[in-house]
Design a protein with these regions (language model features):
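Transmembrane helix exit motif
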Residues: 86-107, 199-210
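Small-residue-enriched transmembrane helix starts and helix-helix packing motifs
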Residues: 1-20, 97, 104-122
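Juxtamembrane transmembrane-helix termini in multi-pass membrane transport proteins
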Residues: 10-62
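Membrane helix-loop-helix hairpins that form the core translocation module of multi-pass transporters
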Residues: 44-98
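Membrane-interface alpha-helices at helix entry/exit sites of multi-pass transporters
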Residues: 39-52, 146-157, 186
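Generic transmembrane alpha-helix signature in multi-pass membrane proteins
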Residues: 19, 28-34, 119-124, 132-144
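Interfacial loop-to-helix junctions that mark the boundaries of transmembrane helices
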Residues: 1-15, 70-81, 144-158, 212-215
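Transmembrane-helix boundary and interhelical-loop signature of multi-pass inner-membrane proteins
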Residues: 39, 60-83, 165-210
C-alpha cells in the first residue's frame, strides 16, 4: 500500500509542478481570439489536438531528458538553476505583465491557419521552455531512483492529467471568459505568476545546494 501512496504523491507532485507553469488560464484569451471564426465543434477539436500534442512533446522530453543532459554535459544542479531562472522569469512576466506573450502579427497568422493546435496552442503556449525544463529535471531525478520505468510512468501520468485539466479549462474558455472577465483572468494569471516565482526560486536554491554539497 505504501508504494501506491508514494506513486500517487509523485504523480500529484508532477501535476503540482507543471500546472502553474502550463497555466491553461493564460491561454484562454488566445483561444478566444484565434478561434473566433470556428464552430464549437471545430474549436473543441483544435483544443483536444493541442492537449494531445502537449502530452507528446513533454513525454518526448521526459524520455530524452537524460540524453540531452549527457550530450551537452549539463549537471543536475546546473539544470535546476537554469530551469529555476526560466520559471521565475515567466512568473515575473505573469505577475508584472508589460508585453504580450504573442504579438498581434502572430495572432493574425494563427487566425489565418487552418490548424492552430500545434502552434501556437501546444507550443509555445502550453508546452513552453518552463515546462520543458521542469520535465527534463524530472527525467534526471527518475534516472537516479531505484525504479526507473515506474518513475517514467508516474511522471507521464502526471503529464496526462495536466493535459486533461488544460483541455477542460480551454474547453470552458467561453464560459470562463464570461464569468471571470478580463479583471478576473488577470488576477488569476498574477496568482499563478507568484506561484511560479516561488517554484523557480526553490529550484535555484536546490541547485545551489547541490553545487555546494558536490564541491
Amino acid at each position: 500500500m505504501n508504494w501506491f501512496v508514494e506513486g500517487l504523491m509523485y504523480v500529484l507532485s508532477t501535476v503540482g509542478a507543471l500546472l502553474p507553469i502550463v497555466n491553461p488560464l493564460s491561454a484562454v484569451g488566445l483561444v478566444m481570439s484565434i478561434t473566433a471564426d470556428l464552430t464549437d465543434d471545430e474549436r473543441t477539436d483544435q483544443i483536444r489536438r493541442a492537449c494531445i500534442y502537449m502530452f507528446c512533446i513533454l513525454t518526448a522530453f521526459l524520455v530524452a531528458g537524460g540524453l540531452i543532459m549527457n550530450f551537452f554535459g549539463i549537471s543536475i544542479p546546473g539544470l535546476r538553476i537554469a530551469g529555476g531562472m526560466i520559471v521565475s522569469y515567466l512568473g515575473f512576466r505573469m505577475l508584472f505583465p508589460d508585453t504580450v506573450a504573442i504579438s498581434m502579427q502572430e495572432r493574425a497568422e494563427a487566425s489565418a491557419k487552418a490548424d492552430i493546435s500545434f502552434t501556437p496552442l501546444a507550443m509555445p503556449s502550453l508546452s513552453g521552455p518552463g515546462s520543458i525544463a521542469v520535465i527534463i529535471g524530472m527525467s534526471t531525478t527518475v534516472q537516479t531512483g531505484t525504479h526507473i520505468v515506474l518513475g517514467y510512468v508516474q511522471v507521464a501520468i502526471g503529464i496526462a492529467i495536466t493535459a486533461f485539466i488544460s483541455y477542460i479549462v480551454l474547453r470552458a474558455a467561453t464560459k470562463l471568459d464570461k464569468v471571470l472577465g478580463a479583471v478576473g483572468m488577470n488576477a488569476m494569471s498574477r496568482i499563478m505568476g507568484f506561484l511560479l516565482i516561488c517554484i523557480g526560486i526553490q529550484f535555484v536554491i536546490n541547485g545551489v545546494l547541490g553545487v555546494v554539497h558536490g564541491a
